[in-house]
Amino acid sequence: MRAKTLLAAIACAVLLISCGEKKEYIFNGENLDGWKTVLKDDADAITGASTFSAKDSLMRVTGKPFGYIRTEKKYADYKLHLEWRWTGGEGVDGGIFNRLQDGDVVWPLGVQLQMTPKDMGALMGGIKMDGIEGPFYRKPRVVEESPEKPVGEWNEMDFLCKGREMKVWLNGVLVNEASCDATEGYIAIQSEGGPMEFRNIYLTRSK
């Protein structure tokens, strides 16, 4: 009887959570509709055309030339979820921008979430954060065992942006948090040196 009661309580909790949040996939897995590419000024049509591509439910990034692909829409309060892996045999520099501002330059104004090996989860950028004018850099939290997975394996990142609050989880472990003066902006994925793949890119927001 107690077991049945416990299972019922768990089921109710799951139902409440699912009813309270709605997933919005910002990458459809088939093409790059809803995204805009920004590359270095000297990138020509040949080298830049395939920097970002969509195939087999994956967004693929070559890493060359430098630049990023951003959403066409701006977003305010959300929790961003995405999964990625390095595909070139070694970890490379990479990043995700949140609260990205207008301008469409290769080194934009926004909050960059570092995806570099051994610096995973660091926050940096030119926006005012924690009451300090940019440029800004906050190291990831020191944890007993790094939650980062080896090259070739899928990592999961969750990035909460709610008002001025920011929190970052890497594979379920809280690795960073800060406050940011910007409360709205684009979301972007960098091309910065080497190949990576992304999947399951979506937002959850309270209804």
Please place each PLM-identified region on the residue numbering.
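Hydrophobic h-region of N-terminal signal peptides that target proteins for export
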Residues: A11-S18
